[in-house]
Amino acid sequence: MALKLVYGVFTLALLGISSVNADCSLKIPESVENEKTPVIMVRKSLKTFEYDLFQPTGEVTNFPERTELLLACTGAQNYFKNGEESVTLMCHNNEFDDGQGNGLDLFTCVKTPTAELRKTKERCSLGDLYVYDVVFRISEEELVGPVYDICYNEYSQKPAYSRNIINGAAVNYRVPESETDLTVSLAKDFTTRDVNNYFKLENQKQRFQGYTIDGKPLVDDKNFFAPGQLAPDTSMITPADKLSTYDYANIVPQYKTVYDGNVWRVENITRDLAVNRQAKFEVYTGGYERLTALHNGKEEEIFLSAKKYVHEIPKYIYKFVVDKENDAGIVFFTLNNPHVKNVKGTEFCKNQCEEANVLDSNFKDWTQGYTFCCTWNNVKDYVRALPQDIEINNLLKFN
């Protein structure tokens, strides 16, 4: 099923929103830059009380007269200063207001709105797992979204992949990123505190004492495991959307030097291409295979905790970028291992980086995560967790 993040375009078309002769507008980041900005939703039509998440069409999104916005402070104990959890604004005489002269800028929540993960009936990973939507709850019965979704393994308590949209027309106007603590919303056997402890360097040194890769300690002061986002906050525009990516269900352990190195570069060049083309890219990000290390003379698969199959550490981080409009795509694989110097055998497809005009010399630097490029058809039989019904006939090129 196609990710439902086209909601903004659908809503704007339904309401007849265009860039000319509009009566009201929202400008980003100005309209959403306060970290306590409420979730903004657009009423689908005046004939229904259904809403879609606001999806900007650029730096400025225009709306016609009588467009209705719903602002909501989602999450526990969250509300406006007047005690209400939601408020409706109507476009009238070139301004959005609540009928009493109060505009969007006067409504901030007591804290950043939070999202929740909702299990759907949609299957993923060859039908073995379920898709979880990341949504905002605006009432006991009503959910709005998703912001992105996750194919989640509730048995090993980890994501198979996360899927998000890069909105090339608007993402460069996003609210700046800020470091945020992780939360744990789906796991049954560990808490947020447990996860935070797993990512403490001193705990990792103790956990992996005696583990080596190519004769080097698995973990040291420079190379250690960090919580690496799959759907990145850098692809999200509003504070609430960004906060939703800091859930452990959207995280896999990645070497910090790799996550801050070539994983970061892949995210950046993909986002830049979407901006340059003013395109919407559908992006799947996940881990592939398990990292191994030598321990007591034996090669072992690696897990952050001593409990096997929980908090597994992937050997590769992949990012599958789909440009549906042009029937094009590319799959990046980054080796989650800054220790290995001999990368022979690392690639399992014909490397298409040069053909795709991805010419960053850093991709060959193993200390930042050796990175190569594949066509979808070359690797779909390897990465079986991804939807096998996706058909891509062209290589996505970065020029």
From Swiss-Prot:
GO molecular function list: DNA nuclease activity; double-stranded DNA binding; double-stranded RNA binding; metal ion binding; RNA endonuclease activity; single-stranded DNA binding; single-stranded DNA endodeoxyribonuclease activity
Signal peptide residues on this chain, from the entry's feature table: 1-22
Entry keyword set: Endonuclease, Glycoprotein, Hydrolase, Nuclease, Secreted, Signal
Top-rank lineage group of the source organism: Eukaryota
Enzyme class: hydrolase
CC terms in the record's Gene Ontology section: extracellular region; mitochondrial inner membrane; nucleus
Keyword set includes Secreted: yes
Subcellular location: Secreted
Tissue expression profile of the protein: Saliva (at protein level).
Pfam family, one: Endonuclease_NS
Listed cofactors: a divalent metal cation
EC number: 3.1.-.-
GO biological process: apoptotic DNA fragmentation
pH dependence per the UniProt record: Active from pH 5.5 to 11.0.
Glycosylation sites: 268
PANTHER family for this protein: ENDONUCLEASE RELATED (PTHR13966), ENDONUCLEASE-RELATED (PTHR13966:SF17)
Function field: Binds double-stranded DNA (dsDNA) with high affinity. Binds double-stranded RNA. Binds single-stranded DNA with lower affinity and with a preference for purine-rich sequences. Shows residual nuclease activity for dsDNA. May facilitate blood meal intake by lowering the local viscosity created by the release of host DNA.
Family, per entry: Belongs to the DNA/RNA non-specific endonuclease family.
Protein name: Salivary protein Tsal1
Source organism: Glossina morsitans morsitans
